[in-house]
């Protein structure tokens, strides 16, 4: 069973700057590859797959050094979000994927757990590229961490949500109502 734990974060100025850069880089990657997929389909009537986007992103990182600053998993997850948006468009007949705007009030990115790069340490949480970030909450995450989603609310507050697996969740009693 999976369970999510949400914590309020208190990043310092340097960490806030890196988080905001990561939001911008994820938006840039999503929009660039959405435009590229549209262009490739218009010109060749072919689809530009996630695998092609991912290998192209590696080349793009060599050209644009500022794309090396954020966490690599956040950029890959932006591509996965784009792939999921396309799959939903074709399978579930939802709307065509839209470009992400700077002017929205909510920003978020997701990063994956690998080799202990995300770790809960009491009043702090270790995140990739950010290091130790102060958090406030008394709950202790149980189970194995799968990923972390870093988000910023319109009020300017930062949050981190940990998705954990192998968590035992108590079943409610049947009230027969």
Where do the protein language model's features map onto the residues?
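Nucleic-acid substrate recognition interfaces
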Residues: 1-177
């Amino acid at each position: 069973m999976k369970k999510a734990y949400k914590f309020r974060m208190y990043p310092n100025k340097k960490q806030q700057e890196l988080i905001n850069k990561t939001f911008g880089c994820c938006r840039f990657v999503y929009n660039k590859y959405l435009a590229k997929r549209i262009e490739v389909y218009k010109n060749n009537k072919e689809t530009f797959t996630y695998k092609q986007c991912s290998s192209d992103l590696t080349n793009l990182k060599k050209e644009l050094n500022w794309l090396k600053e954020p966490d690599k998993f956040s950029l890959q997850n932006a591509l996965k979000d784009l792939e999921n948006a396309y799959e939903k468009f074709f399978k579930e007949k939802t709307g065509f994927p839209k470009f992400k705007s700077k002017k929205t009030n909510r920003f978020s990115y997701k990063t994956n757990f690998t080799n202990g790069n995300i770790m809960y340490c009491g009043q702090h949480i270790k995140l990739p590229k950010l290091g130790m970030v102060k958090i406030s909450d008394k709950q202790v995450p149980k189970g194995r961490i799968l990923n972390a989603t870093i988000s910023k609310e319109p009020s300017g507050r930062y949050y981190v949500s940990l998705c954990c697996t192998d968590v035992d969740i108590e079943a409610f009693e049947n009230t027969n109502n």
